[in-house]
Amino acid sequence: MTKDETLLVFTLVVSSVSVFLFGILLFMVLISATRDFRERTKSKLVKIMIWAGIVVITFAIAVRIYPIFIFLLKERIKPLVEALYDKLPWIWEVSLSRYWDRLIDFLDRYLWACAQRIQTGIRKQKGEFVVTFSCRVKKRLYARAIEVGIHLSLLSNLFWILKTTLAVGYRLLWVLYYIISFEGFLGSFRLYLVYFGFYCLLFSGKWLRTSEDRGERQAQISGILLRGMLIECAFSVLCLEEDSNLHAL
């Protein structure tokens, strides 16, 4: 393989690992919220969320790994991928829409303003999470794991940008363009699943003992969520710019 192809394979592996770790965090949230949440919903919604998480995470890993097989089996897979590219033009039309661009810009500014207010209070708080998961993991440790997952996701996205910048050749750029366009929608959907799991945990009456305790935990969880949303919004804007540049080529 060439230097560019080796870089692509390396970054795909790194990003796939980050998706896998992010998926583990999602299931930790869902499993921890299952007991109380099942009593309220009779477990239907919980099962739907778990299966949706399995499908989305599996699909995310498949989307990021499939270019490796394209490079290993170029002649056999290339016609199939080209046919798929021709039959799904709506993905690129949506990602290049002006309305989508404006929406991302609005969310970026709004969430940045909210995060500035909340993070100031979060950094000054040093209290530990009191209640443990069913697996006896401290919630403070869990919050740190969430932050590590978010930073791994950011690192993965930076690898994607670096890979696109260093890529040369029309075919490789075309593959990257396909991945980036598809990942924008997929990443947003996966993020919404994670947020829903967080709120299931946040409003379970297990560890929100007092109003003061509730406010502190909500501030901590909200800060983590806002930081993740800011990262995703910033990456979406970068993806739109890359889409426009690649489309011009």
Curated annotation (Swiss-Prot):
Keywords: Chloroplast, Plastid. The keyword Plastid applies. GO terms for cellular component: chloroplast; plastid. It is found in: Plastid, Chloroplast. Its main location: plastid. It comes from the Eukaryota. The keyword Chloroplast applies. Belongs to the ycf73 family. This is Uncharacterized protein ycf73. It comes from Oryza sativa subsp. indica.
